[in-house]
A protein has these predicted regions:
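Divalent metal-coordination and catalytic microenvironments
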Residues: 6, 24, 64, 125, ...
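Core catalytic region of metal-dependent phosphoesterases/phosphodiesterases
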Residues: 1-56, 114-118
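Active-site neighborhood of phospho(di)ester-bond hydrolases with catalytic His/Asp-centered motifs
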Residues: 1, 18-25, 49-54, 67-68, ...
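Binuclear metal-dependent hydrolase catalytic cores centered on His/Asp/Glu-rich metal-binding motifs
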Residues: 59-113, 182-185
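Conserved beta-sheet core of the metallophosphoesterase superfamily
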Residues: 96, 101-167
């Protein structure tokens, strides 16, 4: 079913515009080889190209390097060195010092300054969208786990002539949200329902409230609106993570 949907999607895209796909590490069967990939089925679709090896294009009078996943950081550095004329790079790279989530940095790969000489570099691989100097980690198009909370997801449109970038945020796919029930008392229920619709919700509840009817009443009113709502009971004296009280999404 998934393969059928994917092929159908790229068939439709191929009828609209040329599609260029670089292989990522989750697409390959062997850890250090791009020879066998899960997206080989797409390469037979008209107007769709799948790249397992680097290739250089001249688009809008700019040298564009498409660099799929390399077997290690040394191989990646070698590929970049072999294409010194590149101006813009589209890649799937592991970069040291890039955030994996809001708090943890990646400790593997090349340093980000390896890309400083380029006009712009767009990379996948790291799910957490972020910008560092010339490098844009585009992230995943939708939230996958709680680690993606509050990190914008979507896709980018780049004008290669002007290098103007337009980000289209994904407001359709489910998101992970976090609320504290004490902060909801003065919020209209309709507003709360609208925000949690189709989303995954962590609801933090002080133990003294969990034993009252307030929690069950709220759950009964909203549980069919969200994808899932999970109450998390805590002892208020032990609550030291101030982030749990942040409900800036509510207006």
């Amino acid at each position: 079913k998934v393969l059928n949907y994917t092929v159908n999607l790229f068939e439709r895209l191929g009828k609209i515009l040329p599609v260029h796909i670089i292989v990522g590490n989750h697409d390959i069967w062997a850890k250090k080889s791009n020879e066998i990939t899960s997206i080989d089925s797409l390469k037979w679709i008209p107007n769709v190209q799948v790249y397992t090896d680097p290739i250089m294009y001249n688009w809008s009078d700019r040298k564009i390097l498409l660099m799929p996943w390399r077997r290690d950081s040394a191989h990646e550095a070698e590929t970049l060195a072999d294409n010194p004329q590149s101006e813009i790079v589209f890649c799937h790279s592991e970069v040291r010092g890039i955030y994996l989530n809001s708090k943890v940095k990646n400790q593997h790969g090349n340093e980000s300054n390896i890309y400083d000489k380029y006009t712009r570099v767009y990379s996948g691989h790291i799910h957490y969208r972020q910008n560092k100097n010339k490098l844009l980690m585009v992230g995943v198009p939708y939230q996958l786990t709680r680690s993606d909370m509050n990190n914008p997801k979507g896709f980018d449109l780049v004008d290669l002539e002007t290098m103007e970038e337009t980000f289209f945020e994904n407001h359709i796919s489910p998101k992970f949200l976090r609320y504290n029930i004490k902060m909801l008392y003065d919020i209209p229920l309709g507003n709360f329902k609208k925000q949690i619709e189709n989303n995954f919700v962590d609801l933090y509840v002080p133990s003294e409230i969990a034993t009252t009817s307030a929690l069950s009443n709220l759950i009964n009113k909203v549980q069919k609106i969200s994808r899932r709502i999970e109450p998390n009971i805590y002892q208020e004296d032990n609550m030291i993570d101030k982030d749990l009280y942040d409900i800036d999404e509510i207006e």
